[in-house]
Amino acid sequence: MGHGSDGGGGQAGTWNVLKRVSSWIDVVTEDELSPGDVHVVDLGGIEVAVFNVAGQYFAIEDVCTHDGSEISTGCLYDHVIECPRHGARFDVRTGEVLEPPAYEPVQTFKVRVENGMIQVGDDQ
């Protein structure tokens, strides 16, 4: 009866875990990051690229999962960044691979704006 059930009709033993951001790192002001631009910041040894896509901000690890090169220097088309080395494409909103030769997504980071300052969440 009460054993092995979560009481909510779902599968036993499955839980939704919310990940909290431990701290926020100031990156750049909104005025300094125009639509279509990117700014790279070191987040505890991880290079993070912050993009302005039509007034919305997104952050991904600045590394192509295909060969480890930086992708922030590639071409940004709307929400898609293309790696300058071999042409892999990633969605900067989700980190999803849109075109090989990469097959693994890039890590994404939470972004917020506080008093005109774009901040990236350090949830490592």
What are the functions of these language-model segments?
Residues 82, 103:
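Short acidic-hydrophobic sequence patches enriched in Asp/Glu that either
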Residues 100:
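Short glycine/proline-centered loop/turn elements that form peptide/ligand docking sites
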